[in-house]
Amino acid sequence: MSTWANLGLQDSASPLMEQLIFFHDHALLILVMITVLVGYLMFMLFFNSYVNRFLLHGQLIEMIWTILPAIILLFIAMPSLRLLYLLDEINEPSITLKSIGHQWYWSYEYSDFNNIEFDSYMIPTNELANDGFRLLDVDNRIILPMNSQIRILVTAADVIHSWTVPALGVKVDGTPGRLNQTNFFINRPGLFYGQCSEICGANHSFMPIVIESVPVNYFIKWISNSVNS
C-alpha cells in the first residue's frame, strides 16, 4: 500500500506489476536523457557568442532530428506493446472471482464454489481498530491463494466503477450490463489494498478493496469453512 512520502510506485506483488515497473523505469530513463540533451542545447544556444547570419537550412540536422525521435519512439513502443498483450492474456485460471460494484460497496462471488458470496463495506472511522487503516479497511476481505493464476470478472449494478489494486497492477472498469475480465498472479502472502478508481458519486472515496493473500492450504480450509457455514 502507499505510505507517507513515498515517491515511487508500490512494491509489486505480481509478475505483471514487476513488468510495469520495469517499463516505467525504462521510459523514465529515456525522458531524463531527452530532457538533459534539450537543456544542454538550449543552454549552449543562449549563452554563446557565435552567430551565423548565412544559415538558411541544414539538411543533415533536419534528418537527424526526424530520424532520432522515430528510433526513440520505437524503443518505447515495442516494450509497451508487449506489456499490453501480456496484460490482456488469460492463462488457464485456477480460481475465478466475480466483483460487482455498487454505490458504494463491493460484492464478491467465488464462481467455482457454491454459496460463497459476500458484500464488502468500508469500516467507518469510529469503528476502526487501533491498528486499522483509515478509509482502507473493510469488514469482509477477499481471500485468495498465492502462487495461483486468478481470473477476476468485474461488472457494476448501477454506475461505472473501477476495481483497482496497484500492488498487483490490476485496474478493471466495472460497467453496468458488461462483464470485463483480467487475470493476475500473487507471488507473496500479505494484505493488498485498493480503491474504486472511477468517480461514481458522493461516496466514491469510501469503496476500498482489501485482498488477503494466503498459502493454498489455508485457502482450502477457508473455503471449506465457508461452504459448511
From Swiss-Prot:
- Mitochondrial intermembrane side, ranges: 1-26, 83-229
Ranges in the Mitochondrial matrix compartment?
Answer: 49-62
| Keyword Transport among record annotations | yes
Name the top EC class.
translocase
How does this chain sit within the bilayer? Multi-pass membrane protein
Could you give one GO CC term from the UniProt record? mitochondrial inner membrane
Superkingdom of this entry's organism? Answer: Eukaryota
Record keywords: Copper, Electron transport, Magnesium, Membrane, Metal-binding, Mitochondrion, Mitochondrion inner membrane, Respiratory chain, Translocase, Transmembrane, Transmembrane helix, Transport
One term of GO molecular function: copper ion binding
Which residues of this UniProt protein bind Cu cation A2? 196, 198, 200, 204
Cellular compartment(s): Mitochondrion inner membrane
| One GO-annotated biological process of the protein | ATP synthesis coupled electron transport
What residues bind Mg(2+), as annotated? 198
What is written in the cofactor note of this entry?
A: Binds a dinuclear copper A center per subunit.
Q: Say if the entry is tagged with keyword Metal-binding.
A: yes
| Binding residue positions for Cu cation A1 | 161, 196, 200, 207
Chief location: mitochondrion
UniProt cross-references to Pfam families, sorted A to Z: COX2 (PF00116), COX2_TM (PF02790)
Q: What interactions and quaternary structure are annotated? A: Component of the cytochrome c oxidase (complex IV, CIV), a multisubunit enzyme composed of a catalytic core of 3 subunits and several supernumerary subunits. The complex exists as a monomer or a dimer and forms supercomplexes (SCs) in the inner mitochondrial membrane with ubiquinol-cytochrome c oxidoreductase (cytochrome b-c1 complex, complex III, CIII).
Which protein family is it in? Belongs to the cytochrome c oxidase subunit 2 family.
Q: What does this protein do?
A: Component of the cytochrome c oxidase, the last enzyme in the mitochondrial electron transport chain which drives oxidative phosphorylation. The respiratory chain contains 3 multisubunit complexes succinate dehydrogenase (complex II, CII), ubiquinol-cytochrome c oxidoreductase (cytochrome b-c1 complex, complex III, CIII) and cytochrome c oxidase (complex IV, CIV), that cooperate to transfer electrons derived from NADH and succinate to molecular oxygen, creating an electrochemical gradient over the inner membrane that drives transmembrane transport and the ATP synthase.
Q: Which NCBIfam families match?
A: CoxB
What is this protein called in UniProt? Cytochrome c oxidase subunit 2
Q: Which organism is it from?
A: Drosophila narragansett
